[in-house]
Amino acid sequence: ITAKNSVDNIGANIKANEDLIISAKDISNLSTLRINGHDLDRISTGENLASIEAKNISLDAKNDFQNSGASIKADEDLTITAKNVNIDTIEENRYFHSGDSKNYLTIDNKSNISSNIEGNNININAKNDVDIKGSNIVAKGEANIKADGDVNIVSATDSEYLAHKESRKKKFGRSRSEETINYRTSNVASNVIGDKVNITSGKDVNILGSNVVAQDSGNISAKGNITEAATKDINYSYHQKTKKGFGGLTGKSVTEELHQEINAESNLYVKNKAVIDGDIKVLGSNLVLGDNSIINGKLTTDSNELHSSYSLEEKKKGFSSSIGSGGFSVGYGKSQSKLKEKDLTNAKSNLVLGDNVTLNKGAEITATNFTHGKVTVNNGDVKFGARKDTRDVE
């Protein structure tokens, strides 16, 4: 298939029993969403999932290659060549809203449909950047990713949001209300898996909330920096209950709020003979390099800071009475109590180095669980450090 401008496979299937070659200015393989409902009651779901299948596949775009929530499967070799390669997700959504500021229900849920790229040997080449988000690159043999610019292997995010408020009015100015908000996110990792994995960048390699697994050997090379870092999932809740008495002169309200950050680590695993060519930084994640591995740049590991908070506030107002030697007395007052907690937790990295591992520029290992065999340090020092968890209570 050859086109002067673009070849767009939108929600369709392209299949060849033998070889498939597509050449164009731009190439896209896009799944589609079905949208039902209207602005305040809307559901979008994956409907037509695009796919490309053949024994051998060659996709050659002079400009951009885009694969969104779609699959490409080669029985043998798969090659993707473009100026920019973007492999990402499509997002399903359930949105509903009903009511006003006093009585309402809101639902807003989002989930990702990943792209899946499969083959015996997979080769991805970009003159600029390779961006992989919330998707899977799985090779039975070799997975080779090369960019003159950045290689970004990052996660997508699923989320759930539910908010509900109910208010009731009674006689004589009395009322009750209750409001609840819950929100949480879930990391959707990208996965690059192969018997052998080779990643080469003319600039930086970024692995964020994702996994790179070489079941035999692997090579990661960057002229800039290599970063393997965790992302954060969020868990948030808010609950407020309010009661007002006669004429609004008496009342009580209780407000509780919770915010949690949860570590969503990356994993970089090479069974044996790993070559890390460039400075590498690992944050709140796992780095496992087997026997006979080499790190030619400086190795830095550290924790990922997780912040959590909790607050509980109670307010009261009303009348009080007492009987004493001076007679009967009536008073009116307000009271307030607060509890606030803030936590900083360091999610440690895990570093595992096998036997006969060489560090050619030393290492700084902080807040990290370190397991190792025989390690040789040719240049630089190995420094160890710690982080301190903290808690503030008011």
Please state what every model-predicted region is.
Residues 1-394:
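Binding/recognition "hotspot" determinant
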